[in-house]
Amino acid sequence: MKVHLLKSKIHNAIVTSGDLEYEGSITIDCELLEKADMIPNEKVLVVNNNNGERFETYIINGVRGSRVIQLNGAAARCALPGDEIIIMTFCEIDAEESREFKPMVLIVDRNNNPKRRHRIGEEDEQLD
């Protein structure tokens, strides 16, 4: 049997901009993607901590070091610049493997600088 689990998340990211004219997606600084164990084109669930909105989209690589978290297309209507969001990816694995699987959590500051990360159930790794 397969189960769906949290694979990784970027916690408390701040939306930096939006582009309604773009076809869709969320643009994320590629350095943040690497630290959070996420990849371009991966499906994400985004939760807006300011208004409770939840939506799905996919990732586009942003410029390294830019700290960009930009919502594109219709997603730009779901959060405004300055809103705090959580960006999550999920995976499907065998139920047996799920007992050992530990999602990656990247925590960022108000400027989207990576502060620390950890696999759930393990010690934090300080990044600043």
Swiss-Prot record:
InterPro entries: Asp_de-COase-like_dom_sf, Asp_decarbox. Is synthesized initially as an inactive proenzyme, which is activated by self-cleavage at a specific serine bond to produce a beta-subunit with a hydroxyl group at its C-terminus and an alpha-subunit with a pyruvoyl group at its N-terminus. Its main location: cytoplasm. CDD domains: Asp_decarbox. Binds 1 pyruvoyl group covalently per subunit. Its EC number is 4.1.1.11. One of its GO terms (cellular component) is cytosol. GO terms for biological process: alanine biosynthetic process; pantothenate biosynthetic process. Substrate binds at residues 57, 73-75. It catalyses: L-aspartate + H(+) = beta-alanine + CO2. Its cofactor is pyruvate. It is an enzyme of class 4 (lyase). It holds the Pfam family Asp_decarbox. Gene3D superfamilies: 2.40.40.20. Pathway: Cofactor biosynthesis; (R)-pantothenate biosynthesis; beta-alanine from L-aspartate: step 1/1. The active site is at 25 (schiff-base intermediate with substrate), 58 (proton donor). The modification Pyruvic acid (Ser) is found at residue 25. Keywords: Autocatalytic cleavage, Cytoplasm, Decarboxylase, Lyase, Pantothenate biosynthesis, Pyruvate, Schiff base, Zymogen. GO terms for molecular function: aspartate 1-decarboxylase activity. It is found in: Cytoplasm. Belongs to the PanD family. Heterooctamer of four alpha and four beta subunits. Catalyzes the pyruvoyl-dependent decarboxylation of aspartate to produce beta-alanine. HAMAP family: PanD (MF_00446). This is Aspartate 1-decarboxylase.
